[in-house]
Amino acid sequence: LLNTDVDLHQLAENIKKLPERRFSLCLYGISGTGKSAYAEYLARCLNMPVVKKRCSDLLSMWVGGTEKNIAAAFSEAGDKKALLIFDEADSLLQDRSRAVRSWEVTQVNEMLTQMESHPYPFVCTTNLMDSLDKASLRRFTFKVEYDYMTVAQVRRAFKLFFAQDMPKNITDEDLSRLTPGDFTLVQQKAAILGAATSPDELMKMLLLEQKNKLPPARSIGFI
């Protein structure tokens, strides 16, 4: 159900055959498309423990604190021989040319230094690929883009998540901005509602999630 520019199953199989597990991935694109889930799946394929860090785990109010936390994260993963995952890593790898404070530069420098020397695999996920420092891109073995699900994937997901066929009155154009995360959310809503939910009601909830992603319509005329 993942729409990516790389065959993720084949990628995992090829990585399993590597004599040395020193590689890095940047998984980027639409929110809710399964980037973090794939990173954890990859760890299971490699039979490796996971060390997962969010920016909130690492950012510090003290001078030099964030840099120390970044170094500690890599050290922890190294000690455990774990797959290190940075979730929403854009805050740690933001383009230094846009920095306005010195610590915004030093924390990126620390990330780049650690990425260069780390002997074990690591994965960064981001919804904001364009904001990453260009030097960071050279440190990723693979950069994998995640997009909205294809129409065929949406139809399969409806059957998989809800054990029902999708309503026949839905056109392909109606299904252009859905992700696995949307299906998970609607599945949770349906479970909370308790009573059996019809395909039409489920589809209505999915389309509402899709609508929430669209930018607000711009008004035309004079104020």
Regions found by a protein language model. Name each.
Residues 1-2, 139, 151-223:
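C-terminal alpha-helical "lid" subdomain
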Residues 2-169:
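Walker A/P-loop NTP-binding motif of AAA+ ATPase domains
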